[in-house]
Every structure is written in structure tokens, then in C-alpha cells.
Amino acid sequence: MAYSDDTESDIIVPKKWYDKLPREAWSKYEKIDQPDNWFEVYRLTDFVYAIYEDGHFEEVISYLVLGDEKAVLIDTANGIGDIKALVEKLTDLPILVVNTHTHLDHIGGNNQFRKIATPDTPYSREQAVKGRTKASTGNYLDGDMVWNPNNR
């Protein structure tokens, strides 16, 4: 991993980024008690949950929006945790997955769902055909990119 001497402005991977967790911004929301230690879940409104991955440097946030007949999961995080099992604990509604775009931190859990709605762009189509190899995602899990949320 590349680090700079100025950890405040290092946008690649700041040293010990996880020391600043939990983020103060989450304190104004109700934290939902749930058994998955990879994700934190916050109720933003009566019908919207934020599913937050604080164990990865990118601190990915997916959203579960509850409707009358279906729920929409906006992005499936980076694929480290079991996001499907988690959303099934939060709702009994059928789940429709919508990806905002096709970067790994937004589609990592797509394989857990049957139907996915994603933008129809040349990049998205190329990624769907190519897929991801272990070699292409290995650095996503290297060094300080991931920390152990069990140490909270």
C-alpha cells in the first residue's frame, strides 16, 4: 500500500484510518442490533436503513428502502459480509437490488441475488462479461484496507 507522510491528506489509504471509528455522523441515528459483525445498520427513517461496512477502508454504505410490497437494496457492498442474510433479517418483503454503478464496492454481493438492476453502460456490460478474478481484487483486501470489526 502507498502511504504519504501526511496522513490527514492521504487519499489512498491513511495510516490507521480505523482509529477514527465509529464516525460521529452516525451518532444521530438509531443503531439496529443485529448479529452480523461485518455490517453496522442504522435506521435513517421508518422506511430506510443504512447498511454500513466500517471494516473496509472505503466504508461502503448500502441502503435498504422498504416499500408497501417490495424492498429495494441500493448496492450490495463489497461482498465480504453476507448482505443477503442481513437484509432478510431486516424485512420479509421481496428484495429488488439496484446498483448505482458497477464498481466492486457497489456490486460485491450481487452474486447472492437472482435479479439485479444496474446501469446499462459500456463499462457495465464489459464488467458483466469479464467478471472479476482473484488477481484483480486481491489488493482490495491487502494491508490496512480491511480491519477486524470484532475488535470494536
Segments predicted by a language model, with ranges:
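Short Pro/Gly-enriched beta-strand edge/turn motifs at strand-loop
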Residues: 21-24, 43-49, 152
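Alpha-helix-centered segments that form part of catalytic cores
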Residues: 30-37, 47, 145-152
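Active-site HxH/HxHxD metal-binding segment of metal-dependent hydrolases
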Residues: 6, 80-152
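Homeobox/homeodomain signature
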Residues: 8, 31-34, 38-41, 55, ...
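Accessory terminal helices/loops
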Residues: 1-31
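Short N-terminal signal/transit or membrane-insertion segments
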Residues: 2-3, 45-54, 115-117, 124
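Conserved beta-strand hairpin/beta-sheet module of binuclear metal-dependent hydrolase folds
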Residues: 35-89
